[in-house]
Structures are given as structure tokens and as C-alpha cells.
Amino acid sequence: MDDNKTRALTAALGQIEKQFGKGAIMRLGDNQAMDIEAISTGSLTIDIALGIGGLPCGRVVEIYGPESSGKTTLTLQAIAEAQKMGKTCAFVDAEHALDPIYAGKLGVNIDDLLVSQPDTGEQALEICDMLVRSGAVDVVVVDSVAALTPKAEIEGDMGDSHVGLQARLMSQALRKLTGNIKRSNTLVIFINQIRMKIGVMFGSPETTTGGNALKFYASVRLDIRRIGAIKDGDEVVGNETRVKVVKNKVAPPFKQAEFQIMYGQGICKEAELIDLGVKQKLVEKAGAWYSYNGERIGQGKANVVKYLKEHTEMSNDIEQKLRAELLLKKTVKAEEPAKADEE
């Protein structure tokens, strides 16, 4: 770039910063462009699939799936992880179905959790916006988009037609919310339900509620499905669950994660550690026996899970090694070309 253009650009950048404040415009290569802060989902496999070690702060995240697939469980686990980091969390319960006892079992500190049960969709989104603008709340969960009923629909009669009202409400709210979310660095998670489109001949007939706005504004979209049952004898004690990263603006998308959700306990982290440990050759498997650092830790996966629950130091050690191996590798690779250029 010639000198005149450089001077003109510097003057323009100075004017923009003077008028709109520092950070209104920046070069992506500047040191101020920090790595995106992430909050763990409580599942190691999902954190790895997301590429940055969790859900990104200052962004909108959508989690959708069929009924009883684990959507609320996943968000409550994320809240529990955020609270461990000393963060303030809020739960906007539009479905009026939050179970505090279950949330407590998943590790959520109920006493510190902010909960709102709004009457209308407008009220829910206004509360969400006020919490975000305060800059004091780090995680806001809206459960769910399908339950955000517009005021006109609530005040109208049962048979009245209200075409596109919810989609318009979501579009308007997200236009208003996104700038505030970025400025306050708040993680906003929308839980959504699945509906079927009528008359679809080719492709998937599934769609999410609330129009298309959320699909565009979300930086991360997770599709969560139940793929099987976990049985103890004849009794079903949990679900095998698969999460697909359908959209990801902060890392490569389309990755998958499989894990177990145990009833009354949440995500079984120990089972993930065993599977990933064997895959990465951190945990040795010979027949039905599992060993770590040359020490036998159990026969059969169920016994090893029990052993790791009792020996938290070992499970933390395995988790740290897996995170270092599977997450930091990406950062190192990203930095290598820059070092080559400097030379």
C-alpha cells in the first residue's frame, strides 16, 4: 500500500476509534485479538468436537434435538462447569419445566443460579437482553425457543391464526441481542425443538422452530440425538447419545461426539476418558482388562468407570493429558506457519 493510502487509512481508523470507542475496528492479526474463551460442556468428547474446548463466550449457541434427547441436561452440565469457574449463570425457563433437584444432581449450584419463568416470549427475550446488557452474567440459557409464545397469541383465542409471529419475534430479538452479547462476552444458549415440514420429498423433513434467524446468528449449532439405551440387566439406566456439530464459526464444523447420559447423574465423563484414552493409547486394553501407567485398573468398562469415580486424581490426570493432546495440538499447528514466515 502506498504512503498516501496508508496515511488515509490511519486517519480513518483514528476517526472511527475516536467516534465509536477503542476496539470498534481492528486488524485480525493484532495482539488484541485474543483466543476465544470457552466454557466446557461437561463432556470431553463434545469439547474436543467443538475444537476450542467448549462453548464460545460472546456468541450465540443453539442446541436442538428430539424430545428426551438430553438438550436440557447438556446445558445444565455447561452451567455447572461455568459455576466451577466462578461465573454467574441465568436460566430463562420458558417451558416452566426446570427441575431444581435434577439440576443439583448434575452439579449445578441451585442457590447461585438465576431463574426466570416468563409469561410471554417478549418478556423472556427482554429479560435475556437485560441480563446480557448488565455485563454481570456470563451464561444465559433460554429453554426453549418453541415455548417463546408471542403476547398476541397468549391474549388471543385458541383457534386464532398467528402466522410467522414467533419467527418475527426471534428475528427482532436476535438483531438487538447480538451486539450486546459480543460486548459483554456472554454465552447465550438457545435450546430448540424439532418439527416436521409437510410435503418434503427429498432431503430431511426436519426443521427447528422460530424461523431462520437463529440459524444465521448462532456461531455454534449442536444436533443432539439418543442413539441407544444403556442397560443394567433388564433395567434401562441411561442413554447412548450422539452430538453433531452442524455449524461452527470458531473451529472446523461437522465433527461428532458420542457419550453416555446416565439417569439422575448426567454425562458419564469416566466412560469418555476410557474410550478416548484407549484411542489415544494412554490407557492400555488387553482383552477385558484396562491398565494405566502399567497399573491394572479394572476388568470390564463398568468396573473401570467405578474405579475412576473413586480415584479422581487418576481421572483428572487422564483428562489433562487428553486435553493437552487433542486440543492444544490444533493451536500449535496454527502457529507453525507464522514462525516459518518470521525466519
Curated annotation (Swiss-Prot):
Compartments where located: Cytoplasm
UniProt entry tagged with the keyword Magnesium: no
A biological-process GO annotation: SOS response
Keyword vocabulary terms for this entry: ATP-binding, Cytoplasm, DNA damage, DNA recombination, DNA repair, DNA-binding, Nucleotide-binding, SOS response
Gene3D superfamilies reported in the protein's UniProt record: P-loop containing nucleotide triphosphate hydrolases (3.40.50.300)
Alphabetical list of SUPFAM superfamilies matching this protein: P-loop containing nucleoside triphosphate hydrolases, RecA protein, C-terminal domain
GO cellular component: cytosol
Positions of ATP binding: G65, P66, E67, S68, S69, G70, K71, T72
GO MF terms, alphabetically ordered: ATP binding; ATP hydrolysis activity; ATP-dependent DNA damage sensor activity; damaged DNA binding; single-stranded DNA binding
Domain of life: Bacteria
Family the entry assigns: Belongs to the RecA family.
Protein's job: Can catalyze the hydrolysis of ATP in the presence of single-stranded DNA, the ATP-dependent uptake of single-stranded DNA by duplex DNA, and the ATP-dependent hybridization of homologous single-stranded DNAs. It interacts with LexA causing its activation and leading to its autocatalytic cleavage.
Name assigned to this protein: Protein RecA
Record organism: Pseudoalteromonas atlantica (strain T6c / ATCC BAA-1087)
